[in-house]
Amino acid sequence: MLFWVLLSSFCVFCFSSPDGFLSLSCGGSSYTAAYNISWVSDNDYIETGNTTTVTYAEGNSTSSVPIRLFPDPQGRQCYKLPVRKDLSSVLIRATFVYRNYDSQNSPPAFHVSLGRRITSTVDLRTNDPWIEELVWPVNNDSLLLCLLAVKGRGIPVISSLEVRPLPLGSYKYSLEGSPDIILRRSYRINSGYTNGTIRYPSDPFDRIWDPDQSYSPFHASWSFNGLTKLNSFNITENPPASVLKTARILARKESLSYTLSLHTPGDYYIILYFAGILSLSPSFSVTINDEVKQSDYTVTSSEAGTLYFTQKGISKLNITLRKIKFNPQVSALEVYEILQIPPEASSTTVSALKVIEQFTGQDLGWQDDPCTPLPWNHIECEGNRVTSLFLSKINLRSISPTFGDLLDLKTLDLHNTSLTGAIQNVGSLKDLQKLNLSFNQLESFGSELEDLVNLEVLDLQNNSLQGSVPETLGKLKKLRLLNLENNNLVGPLPQSLNITGLEVRITGNPCLSFSSISCNNVSSTIDTPQVTIPINKKQRKQNRIAILLGVSGGALFATFLVFVFMSIFTRRQRNKERDITRAQLKMQNWNASRIFSHKEIKSATRNFKEVIGRGSFGAVYRGKLPDGKQVAVKVRFDRTQLGADSFINEVHLLSQIRHQNLVSFEGFCYEPKRQILVYEYLSGGSLADHLYGPRSKRHSLNWVSRLKVAVDAAKGLDYLHNGSEPRIIHRDVKSSNILLDKDMNAKVSDFGLSKQFTKADASHITTVVKGTAGYLDPEYYSTLQLTEKSDVYSFGVVLLELICGREPLSHSGSPDSFNLVLWARPNLQAGAFEIVDDILKETFDPASMKKAASIAIRCVGRDASGRPSIAEVLTKLKEAYSLQLSYLAASAHTD
């Protein structure tokens, strides 16, 4: 690139508005400054803090600047800054001013973070004002700049915040291939220039170039104001012409050097700029900290160039140019500290935490990354792993399935969170060491505690636990404290818990002990006064006879008890087998579904060879019946199996459901410890697969196909809500539960969580929340009140998936777009169809899309009473489908 180094040529910038500049007046109002730079109030970029203005003397004049201060010492105070994604890097400049605004003469110190990295500690005792400059490689459309209080050092303050676009490809030798790096400016020196700083408009990117006189030892400078032609095509940083036209040049010595102090030891990135502004072409070596980095570098007349160096683990910096031929010279230099950005927490963890925050109904202040630069409130981390979660005194009511996604947890504290029912959704937390569920209203141990193989502390005190302590707790070999105080537990404790090294606390229970005492009459265990009665010889003889008779009688009685016990056990086994047979006969009388033997199931699945799905209930296998029909076989885990009556009811319910848009129930197997359900197999896979799963890469669904799927699924749900008797709430509507056949007809599947209700049951209160994160109705979660409108909410999420072509919870985009409902709802309400799936762009009828989007938005309304019925949803979707068909017909006719 050829350009003319002529200062006057930059006057054009004095009269044009700079493109891409963001200038925030922190605590101030909007105004236009010199060179047409627009400063705006920071009110739209941060929600916390107080504002004031400070006036102070500066030389012979006074300055008055706004300040935003943050009295709350807890957490992060963050600015969310928009960034253009077409840029490769941006400059972030923050100015911090104290100047005794509070008349306390106590300048604060605080941390500054950009994204996940603490970049610096601002100490206004050292410099006031303090200017911090950072170069950030663009990898998102926004970033967070946060202030974090230092304990005992006052409250953070800020005066201004600037975002400036940098030249494309600039600073690439440091940032290229390393998107997890931030550059923090240490020095930017306009070598050889002594008449103040240079910035915009001389530098169109508004970098501040400091004058050279402050850096010793000082050498002669050389300045050219004339017209000079320079070839600078290889300088991607694009330094301003006014910087390149000056140079520090060796006067009489053999070397030219800069000795620069560094704030902190670390890795540094150095750029040296050279311009051939002399008719000579000097040659010299470049030495950094006594190490030769460039042995023979020549500055060619009329050429401009750069040298880039990275120095690792240094605490001081000396740059020396040693003469080889003619006088060494340098036009400018930049020095940056290289800051590594810590790895981010897993998307699964972030998704789970965001869902948990949403359903607490509280703003926990969780934004950006949970672990860096500092952990969120209520959280502790090890590196980028969330290892502890503390949510006491929050009305959770149940442990959401989402907690099970926090796989790195070592400590989970949910004490005093109004939990009820059974302990659930913790079985996947294999690393958990401490579990505190005390001071709740839990009634049952559940079936998952035995899976917590690394558990050391289990605190269940002050609950409503009933019955006996499960033997399975003895499997927790690392357990050292089990607190069961103040519950309603009875019976002997398992002997597997009576071991050295395990403390078991049991006070406050009706009858709980390691001894095999009877709990039929608790009062019999109370100590009574002992009374001594004198006995004569005759009585002693009679007593001996009585003792012998008693021993003999006791032995006979013990034998009798063993006989009775064996009889009862045998009778119970016969009764259990009789119950299963009776249940099978009862099911046969329905004449609605087939009863399979376990042998038949094993043959159909080829010994359970092909797994096609897995969930909390068990696994699903692909099978083939003797007549060639393909089936999906759902096998329940032992711990998820139902009692006989419950299983009969479930099979009866499934046998009654017959609709073209519901997956057909083919039969079942019910044998001791075996509960298996058999459904028709649909070869087209799930809707989720077609939208963003493996099938989406091979065949994408167009808009009319998506509407057809939506109509089919709505028909199935409408039958459940309004066509069957009793009516049924599905409870787990999601795109992976909408299956497609080979002709792309959709059917709703998986009624394992479904709930029957009559017209008298306008709502149903549950003690356990069932469903999938991202689809759960927030009102159902918070109130435990289940209605058909909960299905409508979940189906609304599916409609948004069809429109946007993405998952309900996704960490791939910006933090704002993580939750599909919260992201899509305001955009679609504003008619912003830019968020529609890219695959659908320019292929849909706007009226059809608008109608589908409108009903989807109503479905996901937070207030259940304002949501439409599924029948109304079906009507609107049919209308949208008809509009799209008409649009396609008109387009074909036009073509």
Swiss-Prot record:
It is found in: Membrane. Glycans are attached at residues 36, 50, 60, 140, 195, 234, 318, 416, 436, 462, 498, 521. Residues 1-16 form the signal peptide. InterPro entries: Kinase-like_dom_sf (IPR011009), Leu-rich_rpt (IPR001611), Leu-rich_rpt_typical-subtyp (IPR003591), LRR_dom_sf (IPR032675), Malectin-like_Carb-bd_dom (IPR024788), Prot_kinase_dom (IPR000719), Protein_kinase_ATP_BS (IPR017441), Ser/Thr_kinase_AS (IPR008271). Pfam families: LRR_8, Malectin_like, Pkinase. One of its GO terms (cellular component) is membrane. It is a single-pass type I membrane protein. Residues 606-888 form the Protein kinase domain. Residues 566-895 are cytoplasmic. The active site is at residue 732. It catalyses: L-seryl-[protein] + ATP = O-phospho-L-seryl-[protein] + ADP + H(+); L-threonyl-[protein] + ATP = O-phospho-L-threonyl-[protein] + ADP + H(+). The modification Phosphoserine is found at residue 736. Residues 17-544 are extracellular. Keywords: ATP-binding, Glycoprotein, Kinase, Leucine-rich repeat, Membrane, Nucleotide-binding, Phosphoprotein, Receptor, Repeat, Serine/threonine-protein kinase, Signal, Transferase, Transmembrane, Transmembrane helix. GO terms for molecular function: ATP binding; protein serine kinase activity; protein serine/threonine kinase activity. Belongs to the protein kinase superfamily. Ser/Thr protein kinase family. This is Probable LRR receptor-like serine/threonine-protein kinase At5g48740. It comes from Arabidopsis thaliana (Mouse-ear cress).
